[in-house]
From Swiss-Prot:
The gene is LSM6. This is U6 snRNA-associated Sm-like protein LSm6. GO terms for biological process: maturation of SSU-rRNA; mRNA splicing, via spliceosome; tRNA processing. GO terms for molecular function: RNA binding. InterPro entries: Lsm6/sSmF (IPR016487), LSM_dom_sf (IPR010920), Sm (IPR047575), Sm_dom_euk/arc (IPR001163). One of its GO terms (cellular component) is sno(s)RNA-containing ribonucleoprotein complex. The keyword Cell wall biogenesis/degradation does not apply. It comes from Coprinopsis cinerea (strain Okayama-7 / 130 / ATCC MYA-4618 / FGSC 9003) (Inky cap fungus).
Length: 95
């Protein structure tokens, strides 16, 4: 009886993607009119409906809540955020 070498363990497989693939432009077009979270470089979050944005990432939002450390500190009907302050934009609801 010859000892056969055991097969080498396989490296773990990356998890299956849970989001749609596409360009950032496709994502941004898809979230206009939807609820989003905008995180600023300062760490402040704005949650609301994305009205529009431009090529400089300047953002207009409606029904906006400003949160610091997870706590809502202000509510605005409309909010305008200058793009150079934006760290990221994420969907706050399925797209």
């Amino acid at each position: 009886m010859a000892d056969s070498p055991s097969p080498a363990p396989q490296p773990p497989q990356p998890p299956a993607p849970t989001t749609h693939t596409g360009s950032p432009t496709d994502f941004l077009k898809g979230v206009v009119g939807k609820r989003v979270v905008v995180r600023l470089l300062s760490g402040v979050d704005y949650r609301g409906i994305l009205s529009c944005l431009d090529g400089y990432m300047n953002i207009a939002m409606e029904q906006t809540e400003e949160s610091v450390n997870g706590k809502v500190v202000n509510r605005y009907g409309d909010a305008f955020i200058r793009g150079n302050n934006v760290l990221y934009i994420s969907a706050d609801e399925p797209i």
